[in-house]
């Protein structure tokens, strides 16, 4: 593999990288780890597949510097020539009003049909299959807040386990695995996505939303399709990468990544307001 060197930093080249369910603005978001991951790669195309910003949670005024640095990192990637496609999800659905917008290297869409090396890829967040989002949004938001606190508690538990030399655990996964309805929902989600993809002649269907990273073949009586889910940056810290004709599911904890995050960022905004001003300047520069 030929590595890309920029300003004394060696980055790993990636043809396509996909991340989803980052949930910036929540306590559970692993923003520092995501910043490190994004800094380590030089993708031709970065697809952000929904729930990058958790607009539902922004009202609580929690948006630390580590979260603003992730946004700043994406802006830097745009400036360096990476094409970024932002696919909207249910937690950032307010951005759907901008679907179809193209501004420099940034595109906002609700779904993406992509041909990669002759294979048809159908990429979307996945909340379209979630009935609770469409009919009981207040209940979904309440559940999201409970999930946020569960993840925060899980972090404290894993910190103690690390001090004891024990392996980390996922409390939310244990809860989901113990609830038959949750297991059935994941199975139905995957099956529905696969059936629609097969009916439309797609080779791959790629989703996020359910925080279940996986790559597998799903077969029906009408054919088969490759189902991929990029996972999340709350529990699993996972993403998808396409290189050399194949997809890989990457796990942050399996990567050997430098822990120095910010020496290549010119400035670090100290508030979301300062970040908004920086984004506005970036967009004005692109328009000019």
Located regions from the model:
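Residue-level marker for buried hydrophobic side chains located in beta-strands
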Residues: 16-18, 46-48, 122, 206
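Non-catalytic terminal accessory segments
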Residues: 108, 117, 171-203, 212-213, ...
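Active-site glycine-centered loops adjacent to acidic/histidine catalytic or metal-binding residues
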Residues: 21, 50-51, 89, 125, ...
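Short, basic, glycine/proline-bearing loop/turn elements
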Residues: 15-23, 55-60, 174-181
């Amino acid at each position: 593999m030929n590595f890309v060197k920029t300003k004394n930093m060696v980055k790993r080249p990636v043809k396509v990288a996909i991340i989803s369910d980052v949930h910036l603005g929540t306590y559970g978001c692993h923003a520092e780890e995501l910043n490190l991951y994004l800094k380590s790669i030089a993708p031709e195309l970065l697809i952000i597949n929904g729930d990058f910003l958790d607009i539902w949670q922004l009202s609580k005024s929690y948006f630390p510097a580590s979260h603003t640095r992730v946004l700043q990192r994406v802006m830097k990637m745009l400036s360096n020539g990476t094409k970024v496609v932002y696919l909207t999800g249910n937690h950032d659905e307010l951005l759907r009003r901008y679907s179809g917008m193209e501004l420099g290297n940034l595109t906002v869409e609700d779904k993406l049909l992509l041909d990669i090396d002759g294979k048809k890829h159908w990429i979307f967040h996945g909340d379209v299959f979630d009935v609770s989002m469409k009919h009981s949004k207040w209940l979904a938001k309440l559940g999201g807040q409970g999930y946020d606190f569960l993840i925060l508690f899980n972090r404290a538990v894993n910190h103690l386990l690390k001090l004891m030399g024990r392996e980390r655990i996922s409390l939310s996964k244990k809860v989901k695995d113990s609830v038959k309805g949750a297991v059935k929902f994941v199975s139905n989600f995957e099956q529905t996505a696969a059936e629609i993809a097969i009916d439309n002649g797609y080779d791959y269907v790629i989703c996020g939303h359910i925080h279940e990273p996986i790559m597998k073949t799903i077969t029906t009586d009408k054919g088969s399709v490759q189902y991929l889910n990029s996972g999340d940056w709350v529990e699993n810290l996972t993403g998808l990468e396409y290189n050399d004709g194949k997809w890989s599911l990457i796990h942050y904890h399996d990567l050997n990544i430098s822990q120095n995050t910010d020496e290549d960022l010119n400035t670090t905004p100290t508030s979301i307001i300062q970040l908004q001003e920086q984004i506005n300047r970036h967009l004005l520069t692109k328009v000019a």
